Amino acid sequence: MTDAIFRGMTRAELDRQYDQRTLVPRMALLFDDWRRRSDIFASRRGLPHRISYGRHQLQGFDLFEVPNPQGLHIHYHGGAWKALESHHAWWVAEPWLNAGHCFASIDFRLVPTVPLAEQVGDARLALAKAQELMASSMSLTVSGHSSGAHLAAMAVLAPEEGQLPPDCDHLILASGIYDLEPVRLSGRNDYLRLDHHDAVALSPKARLEGTL
């Protein structure tokens, strides 16, 4: 397809923009390194506690604790919404634990096993469950990487209907996707299966702009 479909870009150009392998062709080696770094970290620090927030095995998170914590840091892993798991991000915990914060690495059901809307729902449920473990004096920091940054933003900015936004002190989003409309028009939609309404409803950008 050679016609421009989004801000002057063709489908092929969008596909290149949303395929990390165009810049990092050996992605599998990077993922393996994350697991290796996580295993090395856990061998020194000890394994985390597994906390469930739902019935599915992926509706849970890995919690690293510290004595007398100052805060809780919650992290959502990347993986294009369809891959990886909480274990890949254990190594991210080290500086937070050293600073006196507990660290929760979140799992969630993956696309296309569930639609993206349900994955976002998992992200919200996990955040709510993790907050139940906090003392009122603890600070809350939330982060996410890549597609996990999208989930982190949605969990913080767009709670379930009737719920108040979490009292989040800091939101750290790395290389995230905040407007899903160009994603919908790219090859990613072969497994995301979003329509225009979905793309708007599940976009943090729309929440911030007040278009919902």
What spans do the regions from the language model cover?
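The feature captures the conserved acid-bearing segment of alpha/beta-hydrolase catalytic domains
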Residues: 170, 176-183, 196-212
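Hydrophobic/aromatic beta-strand patches that form the interior of the parallel beta-sheet core
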Residues: 51, 74, 104, 141, ...
